[in-house]
Amino acid sequence: MAARLCCQLDPARDVLCLRPVGAESRGRPFSGPLGALSSSSPPAVPTDHGAHLSLRGLPVCAFSSAGPCALRFTSARRMETTVNAHQFLPKVLHKRTLGLSAMSTTDLEAYFKDCLFKDWEELGEELRLKVFVLGGCRHKLVCAPAPCNFFTSA
């Protein structure tokens, strides 16, 4: 069972704030760059990675100031992947990212399914893209031994 997150775009800071679903107001937001097309190399995860929050199914990188690896990968200008569609992947993702300002609040699963998988389902490449997104994270989970999987329903 993976953790469920609410995504909320903060247009003032141009970041996507992530909060566990049902968390009290004391929970701090997890932010990651959304519009900035940065490098796909994940920065070091801070020592205070939020393990005290006991969120099942979240990789340690979810508590990084740069945000979860999967979100960083979607906004990367260059994605070093085995996905054959890499030559047009950034353009499609950039186009879809520009439309995020209309979003209010949604969960991470719906965000990825809409932004990443819709076009590739039609091309029959969803599985390879899914493997890239899930397999790209090199960080360990905080409280669960299962593989990093943002798409499993709670």
Curated annotation (Swiss-Prot):
The keyword Transcription applies. It holds the Pfam family X. A fraction may be phosphorylated in insect cells and HepG2 cells, a human hepatoblastoma cell line. Phosphorylated in vitro by host protein kinase C or mitogen-activated protein kinase. N-acetylated in insect cells. The keyword Disulfide bond does not apply. InterPro entries: Transactivation_prot_X (IPR000236). Its main location: host cell. It is found in: Host cytoplasm; Host nucleus; Host mitochondrion. It comes from the Viruses. GO terms for cellular component: host cell mitochondrion; host cell nucleus. Residues 68-117 are annotated as: Mitochondrial targeting sequence. Keywords: Activation of host NF-kappa-B by virus, Activator, Apoptosis, Host cytoplasm, Host G2/M cell cycle arrest by virus, Host mitochondrion, Host nucleus, Host-virus interaction, Modulation of host cell cycle by virus, Transcription, Transcription regulation. GO terms for biological process: DNA-templated transcription; symbiont-mediated activation of host NF-kappaB cascade; symbiont-mediated arrest of host cell cycle during G2/M transition; viral genome replication. Belongs to the orthohepadnavirus protein X family. May form homodimer. May interact with host CEBPA, CFLAR, CREB1, DDB1, E4F1, HBXIP, HSPD1/HSP60, NFKBIA, POLR2E and SMAD4. Interacts with host SMC5-SMC6 complex and induces its degradation. Interacts with host TRPC4AP; leading to prevent ubiquitination of TRPC4AP. Interacts with host PLSCR1; this interaction promotes ubiquitination and degradation of HBx and impairs HBx-mediated cell proliferation. Multifunctional protein that plays a role in silencing host antiviral defenses and promoting viral transcription. Does not seem to be essential for HBV infection. May be directly involved in development of cirrhosis and liver cancer (hepatocellular carcinoma). Most of cytosolic activities involve modulation of cytosolic calcium. The effect on apoptosis is controversial depending on the cell types in which the studies have been conducted. May induce apoptosis by localizing in mitochondria and causing loss of mitochondrial membrane potential. This is Protein X.
